[in-house]
C-alpha cells in the first residue's frame, strides 16, 4: 500500500516521511519524539503579551467564586432530589453542600444583640421571670408560687 493514496498532502522526502520511516525503527523512536518536542518548545515565547493564549489558560482565569459554586451545587442537588432518585451518595453530597453553605455564612442564626439605649449607670427595670416550659405555661404557674410551696408558715405575698 502506498501512503500517498491515504494522505493527499503526502510529499516524498518531507519530514513527515522521515518520521514515518524512523517510527518503524524502535531504536530511533525516542530520538524522533525528542526532536519533535524540541521543535514544539522552540515555538514558545516568554513575552506575556503574545496573542497566542491557549483556551485552557483562559478557562482557568475565569474561575467562579466559591460562593457561587456552592450555590450551584445546592441547586444541582435540589434538582437531583426532585427526580425521585435518592442514593447514599446523593444524600452525602446534599449534606456536604448544606454544610459548606452554612460555613460560608449563607445561613444567619437569629441572634439577640444587646442594645444600650439607656445612659450608663442607669439600670433597666427587670421583668419577673416567666418559665417557658410547657407544664408551667399550660397550668399557668408562676415562679413566685413555686418559691412559696416550701414556706407554708409565712404570709402569702399577695395583699
From Swiss-Prot:
A Pfam family annotated for this UniProt entry: PGC7_Stella
Residue numbers spanned by region Disordered: 1-31, 140-159
Gene Ontology cellular component annotations, sorted alphabetically: cytoplasm; female pronucleus; nucleus
Keywords of the record: Chromatin regulator, Cytoplasm, Developmental protein, Nucleus
Tissue specificity annotation: Low expression in testis, ovary and thymus. Expressed in embryonic stem and carcinoma cells. Highly expressed in testicular germ cell tumors.
Keyword Cytoplasm recorded: yes
Subcellular location: Nucleus; Cytoplasm
Keyword presence, Lipid biosynthesis: no
GO molecular-function terms, A-Z: histone H3K9me2/3 reader activity; methylated histone binding
Alphabetical list of InterPro entries matching this protein: Dppa3 (IPR029096)
GO biological process terms on file: epigenetic programing of female pronucleus
Compositionally biased region (Polar residues): 149-159
PANTHER family according to UniProt: DEVELOPMENTAL PLURIPOTENCY-ASSOCIATED PROTEIN 3, DEVELOPMENTAL PLURIPOTENCY-ASSOCIATED PROTEIN 3-RELATED
Domain notes: Mediates binding to H3K9me2 via N-terminal region, while ability to exclude TET3 from the maternal pronucleus requires the C-terminal part.
Function description: Primordial germ cell (PGCs)-specific protein involved in epigenetic chromatin reprogramming in the zygote following fertilization. In zygotes, DNA demethylation occurs selectively in the paternal pronucleus before the first cell division, while the adjacent maternal pronucleus and certain paternally-imprinted loci are protected from this process.
Protein name: Developmental pluripotency-associated protein 3
Species in which this protein is naturally found: Homo sapiens
Amino acid at each position: 500500500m502506498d501512503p500517498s493514496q491515504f494522505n493527499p498532502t503526502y510529499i516524498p522526502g518531507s519530514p513527515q516521511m522521515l518520521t514515518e520511516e524512523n517510527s518503524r525503527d524502535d531504536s530511533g523512536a525516542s530520538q524522533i519524539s525528542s526532536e519533535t518536542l524540541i521543535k514544539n518548545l522552540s515555538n514558545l515565547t516568554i513575552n506575556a503579551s503574545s496573542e497566542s493564549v491557549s483556551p485552557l489558560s483562559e478557562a482557568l482565569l475565569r474561575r467562579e467564586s466559591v460562593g457561587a459554586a456552592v450555590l450551584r451545587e445546592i441547586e444541582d442537588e435540589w434538582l437531583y432530589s426532585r427526580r425521585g432518585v435518592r442514593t447514599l451518595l446523593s444524600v452525602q453530597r446534599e449534606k456536604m453542600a448544606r454544610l459548606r453553605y452554612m460555613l460560608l455564612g449563607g445561613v444567619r442564626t437569629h441572634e439577640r444583640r444587646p442594645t444600650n439605649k439607656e445612659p450608663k449607670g442607669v439600670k433597666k427595670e427587670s421583668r419577673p421571670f416567666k418559665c417557658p416550659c410547657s407544664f408551667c405555661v399550660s397550668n399557668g404557674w408562676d415562679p413566685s408560687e413555686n418559691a412559696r410551696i416550701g414556706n407554708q408558715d409565712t404570709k402569702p405575698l399577695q395583699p
